[in-house]
């Protein structure tokens, strides 16, 4: 085909010519990510290699089934890729079994529950209002509709999970599955204690490590794998990979978990995403990745310390549990004149993206909330070091301490300098996706 014919053929037209509206929105999102500071705890930036894998010709390939047992021909190359992803996941986390096909963390969690319980069985997880996840039993979620749900919570004084309460509820309710994991909780969980309680009541233990999997991979967070029957995770939070899920388990659950993913929850896997997972899991075994996770933790600790300073306290700002063990800080605004929505909007004005989040025993409605969930993974990926994290922590602390009286222009200028000092995706426009 001649160049002239290619220019008129939609198969060869670049995105900015064929669909300028979509191209402009993507360019706008790239500018937003570059020019602002991303501090939503569940977000991160994937490396060039992951963008290339996910934007590859693998998007064309259907591959229902598993390596060596596909329902379609032509799967030789995708079999290699899926085997790489499974082997890397098992090696990284010390697991006996891995399934890398789930399209998302929620899909992975649905498959886990399909494996460990029957509809109508009782499951027990951390209350959504106290930091749990939708898929751990929220009444409007599939997990709340298909299963009988009981919840444990945090102690009203310490704001930490009380293992005595967990045991008391488990003994009374006799759940089929106990879930350890969270979406907004700043401390380690005691996986050994959860295992002991599960064994005592004859329950299966499932740990959802979506938020802290990267820390586990780096050896900077206790691993749930030795204590759990099944572990699930997303790949895009602290692991810093594509938006997708994985499942790890003891070998005895392999056959049922595979069946629960396909055909139980999904048809064909997204092989471009599986390739991106494989690449992300390779990166997660490097020393550079471990350094990034260490800076993630240090950044969160610096932020927690700044938000407990005298000016923040005077403005009614507090930090849930008084600090953090992980990649996020939960700012408690119950005694502040600002609610979570107002605080989120204020930080958005200065160029920092966070999300409002309910705190335990929150008196405000869930769309308003009395808290902020602030995370450091994306900034660590961007290259932030201790001085940079100290600066962004001070920007946030100053903004929350001053509220509507904050000097927005001054704070925005400080954010802009940090964004310029730690550039993101340099040369992206020139990268070739193959």
UniProtKB/Swiss-Prot annotation:
Homodimer. (6S)-5,6,7,8-tetrahydrofolate binds at residues 128, 132-134. Transmembrane segments: none annotated. The keyword Oxidoreductase does not apply. HAMAP family: SHMT. The record marks 236 as: Plays an important role in substrate specificity. Catalyzes the reversible interconversion of serine and glycine with tetrahydrofolate (THF) serving as the one-carbon carrier. This reaction serves as the major source of one-carbon groups required for the biosynthesis of purines, thymidylate, methionine, and other important biomolecules. Also exhibits THF-independent aldolase activity toward beta-hydroxyamino acids, producing glycine and aldehydes, via a retro-aldol mechanism. PANTHER family: SERINE HYDROXYMETHYLTRANSFERASE, SERINE HYDROXYMETHYLTRANSFERASE 1. Its cofactor is pyridoxal 5'-phosphate. GO terms for molecular function: glycine hydroxymethyltransferase activity; pyridoxal phosphate binding. It catalyses: (6R)-5,10-methylene-5,6,7,8-tetrahydrofolate + glycine + H2O = (6S)-5,6,7,8-tetrahydrofolate + L-serine. This is Serine hydroxymethyltransferase. Pathway: One-carbon metabolism; tetrahydrofolate interconversion; Amino-acid biosynthesis; glycine biosynthesis; glycine from L-serine: step 1/1. The modification N6-(pyridoxal phosphate)lysine is found at residue 237. Pfam families: SHMT. The gene is glyA. InterPro entries: PyrdxlP-dep_Trfase, PyrdxlP-dep_Trfase_major, PyrdxlP-dep_Trfase_small, Ser_HO-MeTrfase, Ser_HO-MeTrfase-like, Ser_HO-MeTrfase_PLP_BS, SHMT-like_dom.
